[in-house]
Amino acid sequence: MSESKSTSWADEVASPSTEKNEESSLEDAQVDGATEPLGGGTLQDGQYEVEVKLSDIQGDQTSPLYSVDTFEQLGIDASILKGLYAMNFKKPSKIQEKALPLLLGNPPTNMIAQSQSGTGKTAAFVITILSRLDFSKPTTPQALCLAPSRELARQIEGVVRSIGQFVEGLSVQAAIPGAVERNARVNAMVIVGTPGTVMDLIKRKSIDASQMKVLCLDEADNMLDQQGLGDQCLRVKSMIKVEQILLFSATFPDEVYGFAQQFSPRANEIKLKRDELTVSGIKQMFMDCPNEVGKYEILVKLYGLMTIGSSIIFVKRRDTASHIAERLTAEGHKVAAIHGAFEGAERDTVLEDFRQGKAKVLITTNVLARGIDVQSVSMVINYDIPMKGRSDFEPDPETYLHRIGRTGRFGRVGVSISFVFDRKSYDALNKIAHHYNIDLIKLNQDDWDETEEIVKKVIKSSRAGTNLRA
């Protein structure tokens, strides 16, 4: 980590803390998205390389088949191409140019694909899903996409509709809590849902799963690594027989990768090196707050910068999210909050209002850490450093990466600011920085003119579409 004046605070945290960690007393219900180990726009790619590992039944990676420059080279149906161009996709991103020739090949083969946040993973698997559909069976479910949250499922549903807007006869439906009536049947060709709801609908025979062709898991590592979601994904997989299983995520920790390979056997694999996982367009910074209470005071000082574009504040606990939202609202600021205790319809409304700019600041838990794409987001604040599970003992690099990936999407520039206030939070952030080999910029809370200049420079470069390095 480095200060804005290029000095390092590494000496301050080089020695491991000898203080004893106090046992966490957090109530499970207060924490969203904690992991319990189980055992559209024009894309501008950054400087990273995609490693392709082909399964035994695949051909030679050096063949022209495995590298394309245009969507037309892939033989994609004209109606899908029209949808891509309408969404302003000009040419395949790196993940798309490597993945799509393999995804669209016949016979269909499985894939485990990893790429940075905001590089076009969703479009890659949506193109695949649309290309596999048999339109002579318009009321037969043929593709199933699972996501860890209702918000992400709704977003993927929207991407399917957008890319498929010119595909005649396409039907898409969300299978999330509250979206399907008790005795109603789900007859859409493409179903996007959360694992528990989909499992229940298949068990009740509300979904005819007999002719499914494709099963896709978005944010696959997160779902396979959580006890509940992992079990549900396995149950859903056991209920259907498909030709192709696709696992997509920005991260695949080593402890999850073996499970992913079992879930999607004999898969082609696309991976990134660990130090290439962070998006270069996200300028990662941190602030040394005086204490836990002082974090809120720093947050209030940052508010003017947060509303230049729009911002997401990530906290660990639901009550923290609600408390911050209440305080900021009482002080006259227009903010919104969303977490797992909200009813589904209310969560949908809050997120849509944020997308439309009715609130410029959203306070949330890890329920929105993954996959959510709101193009106007120029800043992410880690009010609480992400920790694994429900403990305060081990930092969570993967969640950190997904959180900050809510900005800097599709080649844009964004800012992430992490709050630290004691040895434990310093050490946690330092471990995350070492994990990804990144150098964080320290913002000086004693010189707000300098801090504002640094942050504004990045945010305004993003809004102007320039490729500025802070």
Swiss-Prot record:
Instruction: Write the protein's name.
Output: ATP-dependent RNA helicase dbp5
Query: Which one of the record's GO molecular function terms can you name?
Result: inositol hexakisphosphate binding
Write the record's keywords in alphabetical order, separated by commas.
Answer: ATP-binding, Cytoplasm, Helicase, Hydrolase, Membrane, mRNA transport, Nuclear pore complex, Nucleotide-binding, Nucleus, Protein transport, RNA-binding, Translocation, Transport
Spell out the Gene3D superfamilies in the cross-references: P-loop containing nucleotide triphosphate hydrolases
Q: What is its main location?
A: cytoplasm
Listed InterPro entries: DEAD/DEAH_box_helicase_dom (IPR011545), Helicase_ATP-bd (IPR014001), Helicase_C-like (IPR001650), P-loop_NTPase (IPR027417), RNA_helicase_DEAD_Q_motif (IPR014014)
Motif mapping: DEAD box: 218-221
Compartments where located: Cytoplasm; Nucleus, Nuclear pore complex; Nucleus membrane
State the residue spans of region: Disordered. Answer: 1-43
Q: Which gene encodes it?
A: dbp5
What does the subunit comment say? Associates with the nuclear pore complex.
**Species:** Sclerotinia sclerotiorum (strain ATCC 18683 / 1980 / Ss-1) (White mold)
Family matches, as PANTHER family: ATP-DEPENDENT RNA HELICASE DBP3 (PTHR47958)
Function field: ATP-dependent RNA helicase associated with the nuclear pore complex and essential for mRNA export from the nucleus. May participate in a terminal step of mRNA export through the removal of proteins that accompany mRNA through the nucleopore complex. May also be involved in early transcription.
The record's PROSITE patterns line, in alphabetical order, gives: HELICASE_ATP_BIND_1 (PS51192), HELICASE_CTER (PS51194), Q_MOTIF (PS51195)
Q: What is known of its domains?
A: The Q motif is unique to and characteristic of the DEAD box family of RNA helicases and controls ATP binding and hydrolysis.
Q: Report any one BP term from Gene Ontology.
A: poly(A)+ mRNA export from nucleus
Reactions catalysed according to its record: ATP + H2O = ADP + phosphate + H(+)
